[in-house]
């Protein structure tokens, strides 16, 4: 469950076990544990845990969460969070709660993770939209771009099923579309898709493979890895129609801009730049030297993040 444990790719992992946020609102001498001849207070717990890697990550996620909630709270609705949560829950079915527990998460903490991810994604996308895109960037995007294509796509959970289907479509006189309808496990038995190389709702491996096929050609078995579930799926593609690519990149300028902007969402350096901007706007100051370096990855070159007195 790689993606469930990642808040933002290459940026920060939520540590939900550490309760530093609760410590902030408690008196330092509040007793957490008592025993014969001794007690453990909030202060004891804080001082014991604050230098651990888990605490460092927890504090970083807490800082980013507070900053982005302040600046973008109304940009992500509870409905969006619930929808994303349900999508993952549906993918795991009855094992979802077990997978959450194995990842150190509860439904509530996972929803918080989803919300923060979406807040940061919104900020990154808005910043990307406002960035100046050079002609060089457009030309590079154009060179990699494949315009609209239509393909019959079969999807399988098991590789052996994909192999059996591949043998079936290789047979002389085989009807790929009919076999696809019969064999695919896709919802509603959908097999016909129209998309371009910037498509994000299909597996990236499938889009790349289709982009590389000529009209009328069929693929071998394509293995795709779902980043949200770390689950492999298997696909067979036949491209039935492919638009001729126009010679001038300007004919696709709007679409190319969308693709470039979407690409920024996957760029850790650009993400860090946006987070750094938000932290700077919030005037974040680290007061405890134990956490002096948690924002180092967001600092400008040669800029340190000393603890503030």
UniProtKB/Swiss-Prot annotation:
It comes from the Bacteria. Its EC number is 5.2.1.8. A lipid is attached at residue 23 (N-palmitoyl cysteine). It catalyses: [protein]-peptidylproline (omega=180) = [protein]-peptidylproline (omega=0). SUPFAM superfamilies: FKBP-like, Triger factor/SurA peptide-binding domain-like. Residues 146-241 form the PpiC domain. A lipid is attached at residue 23 (S-diacylglycerol cysteine). InterPro entries: Foldase_PrsA, PPIase_dom_sf, PPIase_PpiC, PrsA_foldase, Trigger_fact/SurA_dom_sf. Keywords: Cell membrane, Isomerase, Lipoprotein, Membrane, Palmitate, Rotamase, Signal. It is found in: Cell membrane. The keyword DNA-binding does not apply. PROSITE patterns: PPIC_PPIASE_2, PROKAR_LIPOPROTEIN. Residues 1-22 form the signal peptide. GO terms for biological process: protein folding. One of its GO terms (cellular component) is plasma membrane. GO terms for molecular function: peptidyl-prolyl cis-trans isomerase activity. The keyword Signal applies. It is a lipid-anchor. Plays a major role in protein secretion by helping the post-translocational extracellular folding of several secreted proteins. Belongs to the PrsA family. This is Foldase protein PrsA 2.
């Amino acid at each position: 469950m790689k993606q469930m444990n990642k808040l933002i790719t290459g940026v920060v992992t939520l540590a939900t076990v550490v309760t530093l946020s609760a410590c902030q609102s408690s008196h330092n001498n509040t007793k957490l544990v008592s025993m014969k001849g001794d007690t453990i207070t909030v202060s004891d717990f804080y001082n014991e845990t604050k230098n651990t890697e888990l605490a460092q990550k927890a504090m970083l996620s807490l800082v980013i969460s507070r900053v982005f909630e302040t600046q973008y709270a109304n940009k992500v609705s509870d409905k969006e969070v619930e929808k994303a949560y349900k999508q993952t829950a549906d993918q795991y079915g009855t094992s979802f709660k077990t997978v959450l527990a194995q990842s150190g998460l509860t439904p509530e903490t996972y929803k918080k993770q989803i919300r923060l991810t979406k807040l940061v994604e919104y900020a990154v996308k808005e910043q990307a939209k406002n960035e100046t895109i050079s002609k060089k960037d457009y030309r590079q995007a154009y060179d990699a771009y494949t315009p609209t294509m239509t393909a019959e796509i079969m999807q399988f959970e098991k590789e052996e099923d994909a192999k059996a289907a591949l043998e079936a479509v290789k047979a002389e006189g085989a009807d790929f579309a009919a076999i696809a309808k019969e064999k695919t496990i896709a919802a509603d038995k959908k097999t016909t898709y129209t998309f371009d190389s910037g498509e994000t709702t299909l597996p990236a491996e499938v889009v790349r493979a289709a982009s590389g096929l000529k009209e009328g050609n069929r693929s071998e078995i394509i293995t795709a890895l779902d980043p949200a579930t770390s689950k492999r799926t298997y696909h067979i593609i036949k491209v039935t129609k492919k638009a001729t690519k126009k010679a001038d990149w300007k004919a696709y300028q709007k679409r190319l801009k969308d693709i470039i902007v979407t690409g920024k969402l996957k760029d850790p350096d650009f993400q860090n730049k946006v987070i750094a901007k938000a932290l700077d706007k919030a005037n974040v100051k680290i007061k405890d030297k134990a956490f002096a370096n948690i924002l180092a990855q967001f600092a400008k070159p040669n800029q340190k993040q000393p603890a503030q007195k």
